[in-house]
Amino acid sequence: MKRLILFAGMVYLLISCAGSPGFKDGKGDMDWQLFRGDAALSGYTDTPLPEDPVLLWSYKGNTRTVSSPVVDKGTTYWCDKKGHIQGIDIKGNPAFSYDLNTAVEATPMIHDSILYIGRIDGFLSAVSLSKKDTLWNFETMGQVSATPNTVNFEGRKSVVFGSYDNFLYCVDARDGFEINRFESGYYLNGAVAVWKEHVIFGGCDSWLRIINTRTGMPTDSLLLDAYIPASPAIMGDFCYVGDYSGNIYELLLEKGKIVRHKKIMKSTNENSSFVSVLSITSETLYALSSERYLYSINRKDGKVNWKYLLKGNVGESSPLVCDDKVIVCTKTGIVTILDTQKGTLKWEYDTGEQIVGSPAIIKDHFFVLTTKGTLLCFGNK
């Protein structure tokens, strides 16, 4: 049986009545509270990158991490593998420190000044950034490596996340009590994408599933050609996802159903795969392949606008589109910025350390976190 542990002094979150993803509410230009920027995991922001970025400062956390950085009110947070949550302010000074005292391999989510994070020991923890205290822990029977997401419905703000115990959980954000759950049949490793009152996720069993968060019941599913290593990305009523054999799929969604689907890009190489989350704009799809190419793909006809060969091994870091530029990191440690129209190289920086997480973007700054726990802040000269 799942158990919920509450802590004295717990504060309640503000609850708003809505029927849509919760990440649009109150997000300021100094916030990047989810690793893809929004609950749909679109990987798009209209916040422009610095025109001529330079390294403003770096902070060495000195403990390995696989997290992406998240930002709340200008302070950047992450958790290392030993369970130490760190917060560094916009000037590069330590501003927050909290120990979970357990192993962590997940990227946190921040919402309403609460940091939510999964743990290897099977718990999802809610930590108050103002109180520096754990509000509640929700226990599952498997490790939680997926980044949580949030959705609003019926006046309740809920947190949705997957576990290695094969369940997708929806819990009340204010107290951690379980609302519902769905058994997928396979462990859940990636973040779910939120579309209206539904969540969409793929798994190692090659199924892409749509779940209604009100009921915890599936509304539709689609079997892909190979297993799905990364989260889907959503723009409007269109969902895009890549599989491990190198295909990219487009799905049109309506009332919780897949009304149409097609391969917008077919694999041409048996060694090709897509292991990072796609990025979407109104006209274009950006995909990072295991062959080290970043692709720009026309959403209307599936034609490749351009492709750019990156330096070194690409890893799991996902690209982000920032207005008219796209930023991407490689596992080798190279940060690259390209023009979205022609794929022209605009800027490049070698961190000298491996990167597996995605950047975080705020006004006039962006942040990159290496696997050694070094946080780098870039901005204008």
Regions found by a protein language model. Give the residues of each.
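Blade-level signature of beta-propeller repeat domains, shared across WD40, Kelch, NHL, RCC1
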Residues: 351-381
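Short loop/turn segments that connect beta-strands within beta-propeller blades
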Residues: 89-93, 128-132, 172-175, 212-216, ...
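Loop/turn-rich, solvent-exposed surfaces of beta-rich toroidal or solenoidal domains
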Residues: 288-295, 307-337
